[in-house]
Swiss-Prot record:
<dbReference type="InterPro" id="IPR010255">
    <property type="entry name" value="Haem_peroxidase_sf"/>
</dbReference>
<dbReference type="InterPro" id="IPR044831">
    <property type="entry name" value="Ccp1-like"/>
</dbReference>
<keyword id="KW-0575">Peroxidase</keyword>
<keyword id="KW-0408">Iron</keyword>
<feature type="site" description="Transition state stabilizer">
    <location>
        <position position="54"/>
    </location>
</feature>
<dbReference type="GO" id="GO:0042744">
    <property type="term" value="P:hydrogen peroxide catabolic process"/>
</dbReference>
<feature type="glycosylation site" description="N-linked (GlcNAc...) asparagine">
    <location>
        <position position="119"/>
    </location>
</feature>
<keyword id="KW-0479">Metal-binding</keyword>
<feature type="signal peptide">
    <location>
        <begin position="1"/>
        <end position="16"/>
    </location>
</feature>
<dbReference type="InterPro" id="IPR019793">
    <property type="entry name" value="Peroxidases_heam-ligand_BS"/>
</dbReference>
<feature type="disulfide bond">
    <location>
        <begin position="60"/>
        <end position="66"/>
    </location>
</feature>
<dbReference type="GO" id="GO:0016688">
    <property type="term" value="F:L-ascorbate peroxidase activity"/>
</dbReference>
<keyword id="KW-0325">Glycoprotein</keyword>
<dbReference type="InterPro" id="IPR002016">
    <property type="entry name" value="Haem_peroxidase"/>
</dbReference>
<comment type="similarity">
    <text>Belongs to the peroxidase family.</text>
</comment>
<comment type="function">
    <text>May play a role in the protection of oocyte incorporated cells from rapid apoptotic degradation.</text>
</comment>
<keyword id="KW-0349">Heme</keyword>
C-alpha cells in the first residue's frame, strides 16, 4: 500500500511543477520561433503570424485557459492543426521539459506580433512584458475536457461583447482592442465557412518598399479603418451556410470569385464594434443596413472606441498589447516575468548548442 501512496504523491508533485525556462532556452526559443515563422511563406504573406495569434486566442478559451491544449475535433478550431503541427515538431525536438507547451504557444504568438510590426513606426512591444510559467493541461497538446465554445463570426453585438467579458473579464474597450487582431490573416471556406481577408492595401500603415509584408501579416489599425471609413457594407450569402459583409461595389460573394478578385469582408462580430447587430437566423442574417433609409443600423456602445482606434494607430497598438497580454496570461499558475540575463548562473546552466544563426540578423532587428 505504501508504494501506491508514494506513487500518488509523486504524480501530484510532478503535475504541480512549474517549468521556468532559463535565459538561454528562452532566447533560443524566440529565435527558433522567428525562424519558423519566416520559413512559411505565401508570396509576401507569412501565414504563421496570423496562425499563431489565432492559436493563442483559441488556446486561452475554456476551463484551463492558456494551457497548451487544443481540441482539433471542434469545428471552431478547424485549420489550427497546421499551426500546432509545426510548433509541436519544434517544441518536442528542442524544448520539451525546458518550457511549457502553453508558454511556447504564447511566445510564438508574441514573437509573430513582434515580427509583424518590424518595419513599422508603431511597434508591438509585448515581448518586453512577457511572462512564463503557464501550466499545461495533463493531456497536452490534446484537449481532453469540455472547453468553451468558440465564438461564431455570425454572432451579434450583445453575444460578441458578452463572450469577451465572460471568458476574459474584458470591458468593451478591451474587447474592441483585441478584435483588431482580425487585421491579420484571412477566412477560408473549409475552416470557418467565410471567405476573404479583413483588410487590403488601402489603409496599410507600412511604408513603401519591396521588403514589406502583405497587409494580412501587418499589425496595424487598417481593420478599424475598414469599418469606420467604409460605411456602406452589405450582406452576402456564402455557400448557403454563412452570411458575411462585403462592399456593395463587390457584391458577388467571395466564394464565387478567384482570390485575386475577392473583396475584403467583415463578420457580424466585426460590425458589432460599430453597429448594433441582431442576427435573425443561424446564418447571421441582419435586417438593418448601415446606410439604409428604411432600416438603418444604430451605433453600438463600442463605436466610440472603434473610431478612436481608426484615427490613432499608436494608441491602438498600445491598447491591443495590454488586452492581448491580459488574455495570454490567464492560467491557474502564478506567472513570472520572462528570464533576463542573470550572469554567471545562466552561463553555467545554459546548453552548448549555438543559437540558430540563420535568423540572427533578423533577430537583432526585432528582439
Amino acid at each position: 500500500m505504501v508504494p501506491v501512496i508514494w506513487l500518488t504523491v509523486l504524480i501530484v508533485l510532478v503535475d504541480s511543477l512549474q517549468i521556468i525556462p532559463t535565459f538561454h532556452d528562452f532566447q533560443r526559443a524566440k529565435t527558433d520561433l522567428l525562424g519558423l515563422i519566416e520559413s512559411v511563406k505565401r508570396g509576401d504573406d507569412l501565414p504563421m503570424i496570423a496562425g499563431t495569434v489565432r492559436l493563442a486566442f483559441h488556446d486561452c478559451i475554456g476551463k484551463g485557459k492558456c494551457d497548451g491544449c487544443i481540441d482539433h475535433s471542434k469545428p471552431g478550431n478547424a485549420g489550427l492543426k497546421r499551426v500546432t503541427d509545426r510548433l509541436d515538431a519544434l517544441y518536442d525536438a528542442s524544448y520539451k521539459g525546458k518550457i511549457s507547451r502553453a508558454d511556447f504557444y504564447a511566445l510564438a504568438s508574441v514573437t509573430a506580433l513582434t515580427r509583424s510590426t518590424a518595419n513599422l513606426s508603431d511597434k508591438y512591444n509585448g515581448l518586453r512584458k512577457f511572462k512564463v510559467g503557464r501550466k499545461d493541461c495533463s493531456t497536452s497538446p490534446v484537449e481532453s475536457i469540455d472547453s468553451s465554445d468558440i465564438p461564431r463570426g455570425s454572432d451579434g453585438t450583445s453575444k460578441t461583447l458578452q463572450f469577451f467579458k465572460s471568458e476574459f473579464g474584458m470591458k468593451t474597450q478591451e474587447a474592441v482592442a483585441l478584435l483588431g487582431a482580425h487585421t491579420l490573416g484571412r477566412c477560408s471556406l473549409q475552416n470557418s465557412g467565410f471567405v476573404g481577408s479583413w483588410v487590403d492595401q488601402r489603409f496599410s500603415t507600412a511604408p513603401p518598399g519591396e521588403e514589406n509584408l502583405s497587409p494580412t501579416s501587418i499589425l496595424d489599425n487598417a481593420y478599424y479603418r475598414m469599418i469606420i471609413d467604409i460605411v456602406p457594407w452589405t450582406q452576402v450569402n456564402i455557400n448557403g451556410t454563412r452570411i458575411q459583409w462585403q462592399e456593395p461595389s463587390n457584391s458577388i460573394p467571395n466564394d464565387k470569385l478567384p482570390e485575386s478578385k475577392r473583396s475584403p469582408l467583415l463578420l457580424n462580430s466585426d460590425m458589432a464594434i460599430s453597429w448594433i447587430i441582431k442576427p435573425s437566423d443561424a446564418l447571421g442574417t441582419v435586417s438593418c443596413r448601415p446606410t439604409s433609409l428604411k432600416t438603418p443600423c444604430r451605433h453600438s456602445n463600442a463605436h466610440t472606441f472603434a473610431k478612436i482606434y481608426a484615427k490613432n494607430n499608436a494608441l491602438w497598438v498600445k491598447d491591443f498589447t495590454k488586452a492581448f497580454n491580459k488574455m495570454i496570461e490567464m492560467n491557474e499558475n502564478k506567472l513570472r516575468k520572462a528570464p533576463i540575463f542573470n550572469g554567471y548562473f545562466d552561463e553555467m546552466n545554459s546548453h552548448d548548442e549555438p543559437i540558430n544563426e540563420s535568423v540572427d540578423e533578423i533577430s537583432e532587428d526585432i528582439f
